[in-house]
Amino acid sequence: MTNEKVYSMPFGRVYACLIAKVERKGRTRAELDCATQWLTGYAPAEIRRCMEDGTTYGDFFRRAPGMNPNRSRIRGVVCGVRVEEIQEPLMREIRYLDKLADELAKGRPLEKILRSE
């Protein structure tokens, strides 16, 4: 799938899949919203609005109110690719959220996921 296809996908559809993934593993939407807020600066109500108003996945990240400066601490593999090695900045931001959702689903404590140290 090309980057442009990913960027043009409806945010609501993608985020619903992330919610389902974490809930299948016993985590909550509130925890995913918290991780998303940490990464992007969107409040939970704004995340819901973006899900409902047709915002694209690319625009969700392009318009993020405040990307967390500690996001570069997110490391690891998502879909066989190291997130820290992704060259295209927007795709790296998208994969950061994928990685946070993966860590939630794997049972990692939220405090560690948010890399507040």
Annotate each language-model stretch with its function.
Residues 1-117:
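A charge-rich, low-complexity, intrinsically flexible signal that marks solvent-exposed coils, linkers
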